[in-house]
């Protein structure tokens, strides 16, 4: 009789442990899904920040470039090697964009 009760107890414990393992697996799966969602949201937030940064940067760059174009159109002589040179700003803009993207690459 004791051996039968012992066997039943062992089977019950084994089933309980198996159920606990399955519950743990399910919990880990949910945590993994939540972590992946969090990573996706973080990546989306970072992309939004990069876009905002680029918009602000382009506004700051395009302002002086537009001023030079207007000055030239009005007949003023503008030094092509000054800090308002189009190529200078394009190079700076591209360098900053690349460094900013590389800094936050996931």
Curated annotation (Swiss-Prot):
One of its GO terms (cellular component) is viral capsid, decoration. Coiled coil: none annotated. It comes from the Viruses. It is found in: Virion; Host cytoplasm. Keywords: Capsid decoration protein, Capsid protein, Host cytoplasm, Virion. Transmembrane segments: none annotated. InterPro entries: Vesivirus_VP2. The keyword NADP does not apply. Translated by a ribosomal termination-reinitiation process from the bicistronic mRNA coding for VP1 and VP2. Minor structural protein that forms a portal-like structure at a unique three-fold axis of symmetry, following binding to the host receptor. The virion attaches to feline junctional adhesion molecule A (F11R). Once attached, the virion is endocytosed. Acidification of the endosome induces conformational change of capsid protein thereby injecting virus genomic RNA into host cytoplasm. The channel formed by VP2 may allow the delivery of the viral genome through the host endosomal membrane. Homooligomer. The portal-like structure consists in 12 copies of VP2. Interacts with capsid protein VP1. The N-terminus domain points away from the virion surface. Belongs to the vesivirus VP2 protein family. This is Minor capsid protein VP2. It comes from Feline calicivirus (strain F9) (FCV).
